[in-house]
Amino acid sequence: MKVIPVLSLTALCGILFLASCRSHKSLIKGNTSQTEQKAEPAHKATLADEVVPKMIAGNSKAGYVTAKMKFAVSGMGKDLSVGGSIKMKRDDVIQMSLVAFSIIEAGKIEFTKDYVLMIDRINKRYIKLPYNKVDFLASTHLDFNVLQSLFWNELFVAGKTTPSAADFTAVKSGNNDVTLSHKDESFAYTFVVGLADYLVHQVTVTSSSASSNAAKVDWRYGDFTAYNGHSYPGQISIDVTGLKQPLNVTMKFSRINNDSDWETRVKVNSGYQQIELNDLLKMLSKLGGN
């Protein structure tokens, strides 16, 4: 089996998560104007009016979520699997540690409200990408809150702190699920929600491009586990199509807890070499080779 630089795996994972969210264009300006125009007659209650408030009320009240993690990437000509952990502090940070041979921390990914940090501890390299200084992130208005919602299994609308029923159309899909849909100028989002638990079971983001190979991301949840009065997914599976080759990332979680005794910011060793975005993209292109 080929030995691939750990940063290549770390970078691939990081860019996957960014790609899964980059489709969410900010609606902050639009939301402001909508708020100013809400002096309208009350509308007839809809299925979304019933479902969305129950989902929001059921969101976890925990400030922290931590878990052990099994992390696998399949696609782009590679199959990779490592252990690790995930640590999250609400409204602040998401950290993922990738562990080789069950004992060595080989890579780390950190998402904050301001930047993405990816560290290759084996080769002593790192890349730090401030959202507002990377063109493709800034132009798509990537929002940390969207990424957090995906990991915490919560409903979201980009550019809003809390979504409302008015943001969605709702249609029953079978006897046990309802599909919530939201669309903006460039992208469409659907959330498959269980009527028995009011949890998100799948999020799909689709480009509105007429192209047959338009980008599409499916973010699926499974194996829900009771935790702190809430159900947290024991597995997240992400499928990305519309790339040169399909890509899948699977994360399986165990020992879900609310540990708060950890550093919420990763410190980069002064001896590590910082690499640039172009270097990262070159590594990703190599992953797609034969």
Feature locations, PLM:
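An acidic-aromatic
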Residues: 93-149
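Solvent-exposed loop/turn segments connecting transmembrane beta-strands
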Residues: 75-79, 99-106, 186, 213, ...
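Bacterial N-terminal signal peptides that target proteins for export
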Residues: 1-10
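Beta-strand-dominated lipid-handling architectures at cellular/organellar boundaries
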Residues: 68, 79-87, 92, 199-201
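N-terminal leader/targeting segments and the immediate start of mature chains
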Residues: 22-79, 279-290
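C-terminal low-complexity, charged extensions that often adopt amphipathic alpha-helices
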Residues: 137-171, 286-290
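Gly/Pro-enriched, hydrophobic low-complexity segments
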Residues: 22-27, 163-273, 289
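C-terminal motif of bacterial Sec signal peptides marking the signal peptidase cleavage site
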Residues: 17-20
